[in-house]
UniProtKB/Swiss-Prot annotation:
Claim: Transcription is one of the keywords in the record: yes
Subcellular location: Cytoplasm
Induction: In response to low temperature.
PANTHER family, alphabetized: COLD SHOCK DOMAIN CONTAINING PROTEINS
Molecular function terms, GO-annotated: DNA binding; nucleic acid binding
Major localisation: cytoplasm
InterPro entries cross-referenced by the UniProt entry: Cold_shock_CspA, Cold_shock_domain, CSD, CSD_CS, CSP_DNA-bd, NA-bd_OB-fold
Protein name: Cold shock protein ScoF
Keywords, sorted A to Z: Activator, Cytoplasm, DNA-binding, Stress response, Transcription, Transcription regulation
Domain CSD positions: 4-64
Length: 67
């Protein structure tokens, strides 16, 4: 499981990017992959843990959990 910080997240569009701790490419984050109840969103600067998978356009975060 990887860790990182939310770089930005657009709640209206339901996606954003996470900067990985230790470097590497930013990881795409979609609201459907956030482990939370109710309205799922992330805040800029929020620490998270996640799994990285390879999506159609690059690395993608799954099982996103606020740290």
């Amino acid at each position: 499981m990887a860790s990182g910080t939310v770089k930005w997240f657009n709640s209206e569009k339901g996606f954003g990017f996470i900067a990985q701790d230790g470097g590497g490419p930013d990881v795409f984050a979609h609201y459907s992959n956030i482990n939370a109840q109710g309205y799922r969103e992330l805040q800029e600067g929020q620490a998270v843990t996640f799994d990285i998978t390879q999506g159609q356009k690059g690395p993608q975060a799954e099982n996103i959990t606020p740290a």
